[in-house]
Amino acid sequence: MRIVKILLVALAVVVLAPYVIAPFYRTGHPVSTLMAWRSLRGAPMQREWIDLAAMSPYLPRSVVAAEDAHFCKHHGIDWGALREAIDDAKEDGTAFRGASTITQQVAKNLFLWQGRDFIRKALEFPLALWIDFVLPKPRILEIYLNIAELGPQGQFGVEAASAYAFGKSAASLSPREAALLASILPNPVKRSARTPGPGVRRLAGTYVARAQASTLATCWRENR
């Protein structure tokens, strides 16, 4: 019985720890669980932090347009997009996927594991709501742009990805280059911004238009 209690306490600590840690990420340069795991295994890992204010203004706009167009309007979960994804999965008879917000991806990348299992999703939802509550939107976006996997050889964050793909800093990306990085986010190992295929180029064209649309809501100070 004592062992069961100890295990329950340990489980509670593991589950609650992210809620205690998250508010402290208002500052600093946090790393993702995948970055930490790669470092522990001795696998290649490149990340150089760049502040949101220093990035090309086209970069956050492209990523928000591509990944989470309602980022500035929801509170961590895009319930409308979630319902649509569930309805589409039911109609098509396929497994539910997609509809993850940038905040959910930050929750997953900082505190959880990769994969699509139900347990991770169940932990991710309330944690995303909490992160949205304790961190400002610009900070959530800044963290995401610095911890997302964005290259085939362990490149994490937009600065390392920009150097790898274009040989320049994320501070000086053009609209097209920013959109190319946004286009590879779902699968940066198979997709390439450095040598983009027709699918990536087509997506990039779409994201350039979306990023420049006046209807895209912004909730961060843009670096003009």
From Swiss-Prot:
GO cellular component: peptidoglycan-based cell wall; plasma membrane
EC number(s) recorded for this UniProt protein: 2.4.99.28
First-tier enzyme category under EC: transferase
NCBIfam families xref list: mono_pep_trsgly
Designated name of the protein: Biosynthetic peptidoglycan transglycosylase
Pathway: Cell wall biogenesis; peptidoglycan biosynthesis
InterPro entries found in the cross-reference section: Glyco_trans_51, Lysozyme-like_dom_sf, PBP_transglycosylase, Pep_trsgly
Entry keyword set: Cell inner membrane, Cell membrane, Cell shape, Cell wall biogenesis/degradation, Glycosyltransferase, Membrane, Peptidoglycan synthesis, Transferase, Transmembrane, Transmembrane helix
